[in-house]
Amino acid sequence: MNIYLDYIQEIEDRKAQGLNPKPIDGAELVSVLINQIKDVNNQYRDESLNFFIYNVLPGTTSAASVKAKFLKEIILGESLVAEITSEFAFEQLSHMKGGPSIKVLLDIALGSNETIARNATDVLKTQVFLYESDTSRLKNAFEQGNKYAKELIESYANAEFFTKLPEIEEEIDVVTFIAGVGDISTDLLSPGGDAHSRSDRELHGQCLFEHNKEMQKALSALQEKHPGKRVMLIAEKGTMGVGSSRMSGVNNVALWTGVQASPYVPFINIAPVIAGTNGISPIFLTTVGVTGGIGIDLQNWVKQKDADGNTIVDKDGEPVLKQEYSVETGTVLTINTKTKKLYNGGKELKDISTALTPQKMEFIKAGGSYAVVFGKKLQTFAAKVLGVTAPQVYAASKEISIDGQGLTAVEKIFNKNAVGNTPGKVLHAGSDVRVEVNIVGSQDTTGLMTSQELEMMA
């Protein structure tokens, strides 16, 4: 009980900072919530229900493990909660990514109760974050003749978790917001001095634009003025996202301008739209892909050339630029994902096909690159179990091979571990194929944020 009252006190303290209750990642607090939910006369029951449903972090957090077990009790009829039906319990499990929620769903799908096994199987068909313990269990059940295991593996082999997702909108309306002129560092988006708060996403969100409240208010006002449109954050006459705080920087931009990933998980947003006159920093652009976002190279200012093709400079030695089109704050633009062009009304401004490659379109559709990577792995597993060739669902591999050119150390590692590429073909930089990986290293981590990313990826 004390831990719950401590949480209530923390909520009051956060209110003074303009913050909502902090998402729960610990098992002990969730256990207290469950006890209070079970006690229909408990004075804290209503708010405990709300916290349990809408404020528990997913994945492999200890909180998610306790939540998943209680949802299983509800589905099996071992616990009765009027506000959480069996259907609603399945709905919540479907949003918990992987780890304990997958174990619970497999327990039910491979169990003896036909009705709920059917429901669990239908939910599992939408999931991609299965690990070796999960797939091994599924394979064993398949070999023992379990019909739902067979149905699941056939679904995974056809990658129905991807093919049955909603198609990407043909037109995405955005309204521009110039975050700065010149290169924009990740420090503007996620200052290094605020690194301590990066795992508390709502708190960290307050440091966007280096705590510039006027800019934050202007961004919010723009959103209120243009409901239904996404805000596109822009580096005018520069490159967006230079610097090293790429993940927390993208998290902050997504928090302010993106889409909530799940109604049951607060302050985790995806799909930000960002742009720069000179494009996006490569590692920042990759991280945008992790969240299923869009990064656009605007080229709305171009360097002027003289008759000999040399860049014209001003008295300060800076290149003279000519504006090709305006993206001043408040400009409404349309991203067409079919034509892969950027429009202002009916006027075509720019070909943006590099922002909407087949691979990047997959990330957008799946809600991020992790889901695509795990999905490909799951499809490969299922096809292997069935002894069939996996159908071509994802974008075809891109193989770049340059005759007579040697390999860098990284290219050698890449070639040694490539999967499904043309046999005997040597691949060079720019290739996009599957590789087998069993070790992941990082040269730069920020403690809690990194562990949180891993837990919520499940």
Can you describe what each PLM-predicted range is?
Residues 20, 42, 419-423:
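Intrinsically disordered or highly flexible coil/loop and linker segments, enriched in small
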Residues 2-39, 360-364, 369-374:
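Amphipathic alpha-helical packing elements
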Residues 4-7, 30, 45, 68, ...:
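Short amphipathic alpha-helical segments that mediate assembly, nucleic-acid/protein binding
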